[in-house]
């Protein structure tokens, strides 16, 4: 008999989990497999669609810059085409993501955005990307250097619609960590690199202000776990922080302006 249809025998009076769940209990594994397959198909479809959209975006780097071996200046109009055709589904066309699962990109420093896109790409000699995200790896791999400059410049030029702090119970702890660090753990003040208002420093440290607390917290956890490994400095800092400290400072950052 097919193993999928076999059911364990139960003595009279014993608890039968299949009976408790009803006649659809045997369908649960199949439903789970179908749901997972649908997610894989959706992600693959998004990457294919992104590649097709990118193929229609003209690469208009100046011939003079190419001949001189210089990177062409960013083209914000071309970047907008990429953002609308490729990035909008998760981050919104203007970079103000509607979901806390996806970061807000609006007003982020162009150099930081470009670095992250490059970090999502596989490295030389078959080494894995420095940032591990299957969806972003597919998108980033479809972008050439000029397109990365273009879309990064476009998002940097957009106006941020900031998120907000939500947890009043943790605001004092979050403020203390952001402005003064955690001396006993060797955690420096966030403001030292990201500026007192969270605006960051162009070409050095990213803008944090107004970012979703959920996203910021998830990245601190990723640095601590080593699943995000493109900043040794942040990996060291995150390794010294507790879950509560991460949550507190992330929520405080969301309220910075």
Residue ranges and their predicted role:
Residues 87-93, 151, 187-197, 249:
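The canonical Cys-X-X-Cys-His
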Residues 44-56:
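Bacterial N-terminal signal peptides
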């Amino acid at each position: 008999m097919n193993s999928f249809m076999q059911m364990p025998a139960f003595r009279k009076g014993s608890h039968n989990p299949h009976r408790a769940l009803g006649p659809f209990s045997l369908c649960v594994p199949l439903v789970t497999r179908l749901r997972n397959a649908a997610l894989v198909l959706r992600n693959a479809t998004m990457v294919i669609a992104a590649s097709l959209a990118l193929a229609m975006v003209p690469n208009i780097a100046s011939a003079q810059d190419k001949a001189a071996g210089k990177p062409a200046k960013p083209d914000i109009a071309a970047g907008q085409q990429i953002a609308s055709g490729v990035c909008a589904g998760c981050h919104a066309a203007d970079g103000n993501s509607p979901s806390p699962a996806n970061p807000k990109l609006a007003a982020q420093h162009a150099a930081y955005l470009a670095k992250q896109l490059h970090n999502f790409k596989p490295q030389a000699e078959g080494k894995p990307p420095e940032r591990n995200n299957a969806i972003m790896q597919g998108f980033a791999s479809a972008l050439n250097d000029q397109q990365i400059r273009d879309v990064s410049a476009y998002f940097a030029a957009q106006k941020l619609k900031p998120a907000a702090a939500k947890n009043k119970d943790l605001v004092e702890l979050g403020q203390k960590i952001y402005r003064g660090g955690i001396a006993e753990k060797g955690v420096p003040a966030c403001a030292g690199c990201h500026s007192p208002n969270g605006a960051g420093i162009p070409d050095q440290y990213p803008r944090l202000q107004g970012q979703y607390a959920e996203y910021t917290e998830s990245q601190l956890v990723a640095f601590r776990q080593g699943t995000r490994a493109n900043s040794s400095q942040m990996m060291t800092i995150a390794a010294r922080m507790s879950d509560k400290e991460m949550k507190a400072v992330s929520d405080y950052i969301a309220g910075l302006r």
